[in-house]
């Protein structure tokens, strides 16, 4: 009987439970970001984390109308670093163990130029708290699936920033739903 209830109610709702948990757990960090008036935000990551950065930046632009860009962390020295100035928010996605040290090194270069740093990483990498201004954690899962999980906090960031600005997140301006039938 208990197994049937778990299959019927809990398993189909796991994604919603995670989103609820994330909203409660991460609300403080997002309110901090939403409460600051950042003119520009940059997302940096490597490998799969770069793809997560692209999605996070897109969602932030779409619903909060804040200029944001995603860059491969290794490319910062090729011009992008010149855009970093005092008070710029740089969000680093650091979920890939083998790329963690290189990405944090790039983030610290941004910090030396006055950037405000947010780190998104997995639980257990608490040493990041000494290097960034605030940290958001996601559960550690197989690295092949971490991208799907890590993008959720960035989508929530876009949501919280938009709500803080008093924007309608359900009807972003100048965006249209489109369907192409071939």
Predicted segments with their positions:
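A SIS-like phosphosugar-recognition module
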Residues: 1-182
